[in-house]
Regions:
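Long, C-terminal-biased catalytic regions of enzyme "large/alpha" subunits
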Residues: 1-242
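Local sequence-structure signature of Cys/Sec-based thiol-disulfide redox active-site neighborhoods
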Residues: 243-275
Length: 276
């Protein structure tokens, strides 16, 4: 084995709090000034990674909105200990944590499109994993509501990944329960509440203290009452008279890299084919 096809991943955490603590900003990610600063930081990071790519031939680098499930709590806890007056996420007296990557504060808005309008300009600057989580209190009323939301996001925003993430609970006696129920409404016994911590669902009771505080602070999105304000797509009617089809010469291309073992296998298998 080798590391030839592995990426060196670079990310950031707590950009929202960087805006709060920066004396020349003093505002969170909902403010245009911190959004502008974040775009500049991410663009600088992209450029540096591009330089590294040229400086270290054969090495792969990517800019990712790293999950930071434990790091967002650990760094905030140590920073608070060293600098007691530092601004972390949440309110005074909360367990310290940092907002993940360049996300908005978790209590920002119940209107999902308000959040998407801001995140769309930031998440598209990452070159690797990034995701917008649509945290919902309960599941949507039916599949049509889910399909409608997915379509609106897909047609009006550029961000690459998003999740529909309702909260649900599990009772040992009665199984699945929609929404947050620490006690089963049917039998009164203790139930487990599940929510998405970063990229996957886990019982809230097993989260670290920082993520547990983040869960408490979340403002859930009210999808049914959210309003799409910026329509980014337009419909253009094209008739047959508008279209002129000209014959084009076609070629088959095989794109490979020098370090990919699968590319070498593909080239060997396709020997004799008319490829460029």
């Amino acid at each position: 084995g080798s590391f030839d096809n592995h990426f060196s991943t670079i990310g950031l955490v707590g950009m929202n709090e960087a805006g709060l603590n920066a004396r020349w900003l003093g505002c969170d990610m909902s403010d245009e000034r911190t959004q502008k600063f974040t775009r500049e930081v991410l663009t600088h990071m992209r450029n540096r990674l591009s330089d590294y790519q040229e400086e270290y031939p054969g090495e792969l680098f990517n800019l990712e909105a790293t999950p930071a499930e434990s790091t967002s709590y650990r760094l905030a806890k140590h920073d608070r200990k060293r600098w007691p007056d530092i601004r972390t996420a949440g309110s005074k007296g909360d367990t310290p944590y940092y907002t993940n990557s360049s996300h908005l504060p978790v209590e920002y808005s119940s209107d999902i499109f308000d959040a998407l309008d801001i995140q769309d300009e930031l998440q598209t600057l990452y070159t690797s994993g990034t995701v917008f989580h649509a945290f919902l209190g309960e599941k949507l009323p039916d599949w049509k509501a889910a399909a409608s939301l997915v379509r609106k996001i897909a047609e009006n925003y550029k961000l690459p990944y998003y999740t529909i993430s309702p909260t649900y609970s599990v009772c040992k006696e009665h199984g699945y329960l929609s929404g947050e129920h620490f006690t089963c409404p049917k039998c009164g016994k203790k139930a487990e509440v599940y929510s998405r911590i970063t990229g996957y669902y886990r019982p809230v009771q097993n989260w670290n203290d920082g993520k547990a505080q983040e869960y408490k602070n979340r403002t859930l999105y009210d999808v049914l009452h959210s309003k799409l304000k910026k329509v980014h797509t337009s419909v253009v009617t094209v008739t047959e008279d508008d279209v002129k089809i000209e014959p084009v010469e076609t070629h088959k291309y095989l794109f490979t890299t020098s370090t990919c073992p699968n590319c070498r296998m593909a080239k060997k298998m396709l020997e004799g084919e008319d490829l460029e």
